[in-house]
Amino acid sequence: ALDEPALNPSGSAITLTSLSNQFNIYANAYVGGIIGYNAADTTLTLENASNGNQSQAQSYGGLALSPRADAANGGAYILDSGVSLGELDPDHNGYFAGGIIGCTTAKTTLNHCTNYGGVQHPVAAGGLTGVNNGTITDGRMVNSMGSQQEGYRYLGGIAGINNGTITNSAPAESSSIRGGLDIGGVAGYNSKSGVITLENANGNVYGITATGGVAGYNLGTVTARSVTVKVSGTTQTGGVAGLNAASGTIDQEPRTPSSISITVQNGTTVSSTTQGGGVAGRNEGLIQNATNRAGSIQVVNQYAGGIAGSNSGRIYGCMHAASGNRVLYTGGGFAGGIAGCNEVGGELKIVTMNGSVTAANGEAGGVTAHNYGSITMSRVYGSDIRGTSDAIGGITACNEAGAV
C-alpha cells in the first residue's frame, strides 16, 4: 500500500496510470488488486488500472484486528450508523477487499479502472473497492463475486459500501453479485453521504434481504437514466434499490425538468418472496420521476408494486407502464401498479398507471392494493387489473384509513 511516510509525505499528491495486476492477492487486512489502502492525507489518483483476467488475480480478504478499531463498539470498525464489520467473528473485525483497492479515502480517485478478476471476501467487498470514501468514475467489473447465503453482506459490483461519489460505474451485463444482506449491482450499502450517478445500470444481483439492481440499502442519492438488471431476493427486492431508507432519494439523471424519467427497462426482472418492486422493494424515502417497464416483477406473497412493493415514504411523478406479456404479479398478497401497499404516512402523488396488475390470491389495485396513506392527482388508463379473490379497484382495492 502507498502509505509509508518516507515515500509519501503528508499532503503529497500521486497519480498512477495504466497499472495492471495478474497475480492472486492474499491478505488479512486491506486487500486490493492494485493497492490495499491509501493513507488519508495522501491524494491518490488511479487511472486506467486493471486487475487480472477471467481466470486470474483473485483478491482474497481475511479477518484480523483493526488498527483503527472503535473500542466503544467492541473493537469493530464502524463505517456508518448501522454498519458494523464485527459480525462474522466476535473476536475479530472484517477488513475490506476490492478488485482495485481495498479502501479508498476521501482523497482517492479512480478513473477508468476495470476489474476482470474475482473478489473473495464475505463482508464489505466490491468489484473495485470494499469501501469508497472518494470518487470513482467510469469503472467496470467484468467478473462475478460473492455467494447467496447468510454472512455475506455489504457487497457491490463497484463498492461494498459507498460513502463517496460513484459516476457511470457498473458491472458488466454478464456479471453477478451474490450475497445475503445489503447486496447491490453498484453498491451494497449507499450511506447518507453516498451519491451514485448512472447513465446505464446492468448486471445480475442475488441476495436475501435488501437486494437492488443499483444499491441494496440506499440512505443516500441514486440518480440514473436506464436500468436493465435481473434481481432476485427473499425480501425487499427492487430494480434500483432493495430498501430505500427515509433519507434515501431515487431520481432521474440528469435531475432537470426537461430530462426523461429514470426507466426500468423491459429486460429487467425482479423476483422476491415478499416486498418486490420495479424501483424499490420497500420505500421509506423519496422516489420521483421513475417509469417501470420491467419485463417481470413476481412476488410469491405479500407486496408487489410497479414502483415499490411497500411504501411509507413519497412516490412522486412515477408511472407503471408494463403491459401485455410484461408481468406484475403476486401469488398470494397485494399487487398495485405503483405500490403493493401504501402505508400510514405514505404519499403517492402525480402517479400514472398504464399497465397490468395481477393478484392470484389477494387484492389488486391500479395504484395500490391497500391504502393507509394519501393518493393525490393519480391517473389510471388502458390497464388490466386482475384478482382471483377479495377486492379489486381501479385506484385502490381497499382504502383502509387513507385519503384518495
Stretch-by-stretch model annotation:
Residues 1-404:
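Surface-exposed loop/turn motifs in large extracellular/passenger domains
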